Amino acid sequence: MTLIRSEMVGFGHCLPTKVVTNDDLAKIVETSDEWIRTRTGIVSRHISDGETTGDLSFNAAQMALKTAGMTAEDLDMIIVATVTPDNTSPSVAAKISGRLGTKSGTICTDISAACSGFIYALTMADNMIRLGQIKTALVIGAETLSKIVDWTDRNTCVLFGDGAGAVVIRAKEGQGTSADTGILATKLYADGSHYESLVVLGGVSTTQTSGFVTMDGKEVFKYAVNALSQAAENVMEIAGVTKDDVDWILPHQANIRIIEGVGKKLDLPEEKVIVSVDHHGNTSAASIPLALSENYAAGRLKKGDLVVLTAMGAGFTWGGALVRI
């Protein structure tokens, strides 16, 4: 049985030039490299110094199009996952569309699902392709979380970084088996009863400010390992594969303890778990596409590899995707 798949044909990423180490943070809050490293696995993160979410997205998009061998005019849709847009309106996607020079009529929208945002955006673009409404989409996860972090709060300011990752997906005919190239399965979830556990307290209709990230760290950690593992298991089940078939798992890069916890819960060897939190920090919606692009560019991820993507974020939202590169 033939059916339409969404094949990942281009990858791109962009990081701000400024790097902030744990030792740098120890100069402004009561912390240390040892304290941060042992609790989070983070050593350094990139922090924007004038670069906007739109700037990072644009650069990542250009790289993704180049690796795909495509131009902006080939795109039918741009979807950006972010909680730190340049403006309240219009969307970052529309801004990128204008800068790239896409054709008139290209669908543009942003989505706010926090750290799960890229999985949400990828799922929506994949569904549009599978329904035959579009053929090619640019899916971006991008954040400048440094702009919504309280730099006097050592519990949160040490965690986050800025960056962007982008993927070009394109319709391709498959045979309807797990041997197909492309997105084989996706699954999304949310549970709004945990709304207050991870929140940026600010907004247009409340405070007229952007606010700062606040978090119940213990609650998030407790929920995250189970949610990330559940999403991974479910997409494997949907596609009819087992953990032994999987080449890589790429969890949202929030915290090394969570990442390791997911690997152990799924009984996957450490060498199959992709980790980039050490030099990125938590980049929210950018973490998965950023790691995908870096690892593909480095030759670690190869065509034909079967990869599980899984993420959880504020809301709570969470989700997974199974992709054969």
Predicted regions and their residues:
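Flexible, glycine-rich active-site loops centered on histidine and acidic residues
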Residues: 130-163
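Condensing-enzyme catalytic core mediating Claisen C-C bond formation in acyl metabolism
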Residues: 1-50, 153-222, 226, 230, ...
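Catalytic phosphate/nucleotide-handling subdomain of diverse soluble enzymes
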Residues: 290-310, 316-325
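Acidic, glycine-rich active-site loops and adjacent beta-strand->loop/helix elements
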Residues: 14, 81-86, 113-118, 141-146, ...
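Active-site pocket-lining segment
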Residues: 224-229, 243, 247-266
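Phosphate/pyrophosphate-binding loops at sites that engage ATP/ADP/AMP, CoA/4′-phosphopantetheine
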Residues: 30, 60-76, 176, 230-247, ...
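Buried hydrophobic positions in well-ordered alpha/beta secondary-structure cores of metabolic enzymes
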Residues: 8-10, 36, 64, 75-78, ...
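Conserved catalytic cysteine-centered active-site region
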Residues: 35-39, 43-55, 83-137, 264-291
